[in-house]
């Protein structure tokens, strides 16, 4: 039985509160992921970690067939019906029913083809990690749907509990199991157990938040066709983007081998740990673009994009200037070959701040079909550059392909949001110039401390703090942050009287 729901349970939180809790979810997950990734990279070594990374890359291709656009599609319909818990619960119930069949079938398919895939890569040790990943895929897909539902409800504070549970279980469980000598297979067992628990926990919290039963009903509530209808376009978009995120790993594995995969993936994940801003902001802002009561909130989108452009530039200088010391500190000297990849991924890192928000806004605006050609074209560009340059340039070619394709992807989504929500692009030019100028000054500060791989950790900490201060100072001096904005921030930060 579902407990009675209070008005506060159903009311959506503010953008700031949702962003804070989404950020906390992302940051806590990133912290656990950082610990686990560094442990696995160091303990397993490049070859065995390469097997683990390749398994995740192959399994990542199952993300789309395991979802069929259900998660984002149901989130859109729920966001359009805020204030009607009965309608929201019916959509959630039908989505869960679809998930059981769709995700279950995809996981079973991965289980069946694990052996042939391992043989195709001439890596027998890949088979069991893939088989166990089939279980993790089911739990992860259900957990993702719970995330989108809480996003649509504007109750990301509740979802934080799910993230903490999954992240803690995966990190601790995987480390303990790997220490028993189970290698990449053991790491995958920890992942599967954590996602399975998180999936069940997330569904319980969704039901409690709505105060309604979301148990799937025989025959459903009549929303399955609508969910799958909008999801059909999202399947193509998500499929292309999923392949986009894995194509570098897959092509590097096929052309250069699993050790090269380990070096590339380590740098890619390190860059990803710095990119936690875009996702939480998307979760807080994008649902407000749904065409429900009040219509798309263009002002929220414009203001958020401005702040993202100003803030995200702070990561450029460390990625470019300190690629070697950051790689050595995180992964050790065996991974110094990853430094060039980390440096080359700097443009991708910058664009990743605003990309999730733009994509999420388009989805809630009901424009999934217009995103299809954008996604397919950027995937083709990335794959073409990789195929053409990997043999000549090595793993850095993967970063180049990602950068070029992402420039196209983000630019196209900016124009899409302009057409659908009236987004004004000119006001973003000044913040971008200011951010790049501040990053250049920050880079000079970091250069003063040295760039060698042997740079001491205390110097990295001190230099990073001074460089960040220089970055903020440039934004203030150039007027990118107004007096009113500084006053508002101070009011939020100062202690209550």
Name every feature range the model reports, one short phrase each.
Residues 1-9, 447-497:
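Membrane-proximal transmembrane or re-entrant/amphipathic helices at the cytosolic face
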Residues 1-4, 93-122, 172, 176-180, ...:
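Alpha-helical transmembrane segments of multi-pass membrane transport and lipid-handling proteins
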Residues 17-37, 165-166, 190-198, 202-206, ...:
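Transmembrane helical elements of multi-pass membrane transporters/channels
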